[in-house]
């Protein structure tokens, strides 16, 4: 290997003794964190070496260079980034699901003796799920990390999740299908699970370790493995008891959710390990039952476009976009959570709805509250940074400004029937005192860097004021000293100067060198002058430099002491943040209700789903005003008479609006059960336990599954999971196979839902043969989307009316799509011929035959 060539060796193949002292330190730390990128602080840079440097250069588009690592290794791969730019690069790596170890300098290199290695240590392990830094997080979305632990004896999983940036921490246990629904809701950045040793393969010395989770999870989510022992009951429960300072976990629901608490304890251990000495504070852990909420599986969430659109993955065009009028990041996150987890308990739903209704009626309170909330920063995440000692001076100014608004918020809401701030009123004065403390301690516009100084206000510390006076009074002292020296020496052009290399100096031109006194000590010779120092000037220089260093160090200590003291307010600030978030969401929902002319729905335990002039919450905001066509829905589950509809067969052309109609009613159910008003003239919703949608599929090539296979899997899941309290939306069941197979499957699925499950269902289809099902099953009714036809041209009227459609108008839609006239004409010719043959075959009872043109003639499904 030539002298300048880089030796592409991996860290695990290196003999530590063959390297330099600094590299030995690096390798020892790297060995403790295998598989994680190690950022090693060297002066103003974070350096990476070996395989880490290669990854960094590739992922961050950095130049890969080399560093000498001793005679045997030569130059090893090196890639570095400036410390000041670290956050930007960290964000890119975390988004790519990399983990990063921060190894910082634990002492000032200036005070390290020559030949010695600077003391370094790991101060933080950043993983996608353990971020608290505001610039690494999405402001309007939670950043969840989950832990999952499977019971070896039965199909039950312990499940726990937290967003450490907000302090939310919950746990439960459930079978796999419900855990999958929870993962779809939370979309975690990281999942922690026990490792599992695989069988040793041929020629393999040590067995590989994988995450002990089902493939459905590991293929879709970013998973991290930790030792199974961390999930053991005693270890996990002791972790929880330590963090929550309790001797028993029974009050948290431990007995009912043991598996969940094992997952929670392991999750805490993982966070503890990654946070090092800066463990964020957790005030509480909540156990919850999934059956308390409406179940929405991953497919339903996507199809209904609850928080992002199906294709572009944008917020614009989603339900969240349509109803998000929140003013704070905390409120935006909470609204998203409400949409993703609708309630089932009528009392809980009504508590929210009553608050929304009150704010709808009291417009002065609503408008005032909205204006006040707009001034509040993200104090929820700020509280976490306070708890783990990462809050900056600017964070405290944001906190001060936010908490200063609290008295006005309390005053604005004091006469509401539902007081969102009732608990907070008890300690409002204490918070006001703390706000004043911030005001008295930290300057209004502090610097970004903590060790720059200029953070603490005057009169906080007499010692700090003394050092500052010494620094600010320095200019006056130098002017006075210069005048004194001019008088003493008689040198009128004598000057006092300063540079970083030589410090303070007295400059005398060559023509006046014969006048310098004996106490002048030469420092530097220039072309036309000499520079000198005196004992008095040197003492002043030492005092100033000492004062600057001592002032900065003292300010840093005063700030960190204040930050440590502020930790006792974290729990109260979180309570305030939660109340503000709730107020923000309720205000947002009431604003949307007023602006979009929503109605207050009746929510009860009945089997009804009655909507008068319902509208699509999203589309009516996108289409021109008044263009969206409203439609009714009257449907009930477990119907026993022929007067009511339980199962709606919906027919009509493509593009007529069948899917839109189905989705709009699902969104109305979800809005109603988060406590919102709904887009309709009136609505009565009997609580829905699950919403299922089968409204389109795409080939899953990664699993080798076709569109039809995906459709059948999703339909199977619905038929095995739905109850009579569910709301089912099925679109085009049976397409993708032969007509016989398709109609048979569609018929059987419809029959099963109508007679066995007895759930409320809208079944959109082009199989008009299904219209005859109403003769056998009175709970099934036919409906169609109306159109207007004139001279072969069709116009979509978008109105849902009773009765089945006799045609699908596929050729007319194809013409609208721009197919060549030759194709359209030939299609029309074939259609006319088929219809004639159908009529003949139906009359004679003949089965399908082929005519002389080779066109297949289809027999219809008969009763």
Located regions from the model:
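Basic, polar low-complexity surface loops/patches
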Residues: 1-333, 338-361, 381-384, 388, ...
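Short hinge/gating elements
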Residues: 12, 67-79, 245-254, 305-309, ...
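Amphipathic alpha-helical transducer elements in NTP-driven molecular machines
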Residues: 20-23, 39, 50, 80-90, ...
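ATPase nucleotide-binding head domains, primarily ABC-like/P-loop NTPase cores
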Residues: 34, 50-53, 257, 327-328, ...
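A conserved P-loop NTPase coupling/switch region
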Residues: 45-46, 50-66, 158, 168-170, ...
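Amphipathic heptad-repeat alpha-helical coiled-coil/stalk segments that mediate oligomerization
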Residues: 233-238, 295, 310, 401-476, ...
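Hydrophobic alpha-helical segments characteristic of transmembrane helices
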Residues: 370-373, 397-400, 573-582, 586-590
